[in-house]
Amino acid sequence: MSRGGSFGGGQSSLGYLFGSDNEIPKTPAPPVAPKPAPPYGVDSTEEDHEADQKPKISNNNYQRVQGQNSGNFVTDRPTTKVKSVPGGGSSLGYLFGDK
């Protein structure tokens, strides 16, 4: 058997990767007809609903003297504002015991 010769098994089936001299012409798919509209009408679109809906207003977004992100705005927790300087007193006394 010479180098580069076929050793049986027929021709390679990798023609789809590297191109083939024996390409089979493909028939184009038939065009898809558009779907006809139903005789009873169509549903309304989102544009119609936008005008009907009232704007949503948050009932807990009101003016505060300290600013909007203070107090129990969303989480019903006290403010997280830093109250001591770096290296100063710790607010973790309840964990480690006040000294």
Swiss-Prot record:
Keywords: Microtubule, Phosphoprotein. Coiled coil: none annotated. Residues 27-39 have a biased composition (Pro residues). The modification Phosphoserine is found at residue 58. It comes from the Eukaryota. Expressed exclusively in stems and flowers. Residues 1-12 have a biased composition (Gly residues). Residues 56-73 have a biased composition (Polar residues). InterPro entries: SPR1/2/3/4/5 (IPR039613). One of its GO terms (biological process) is cortical microtubule organization. One of its GO terms (cellular component) is microtubule. Acts redundantly with SPR1 in maintaining the cortical microtubules organization essential for anisotropic cell growth. This is Protein SPIRAL1-like 5.
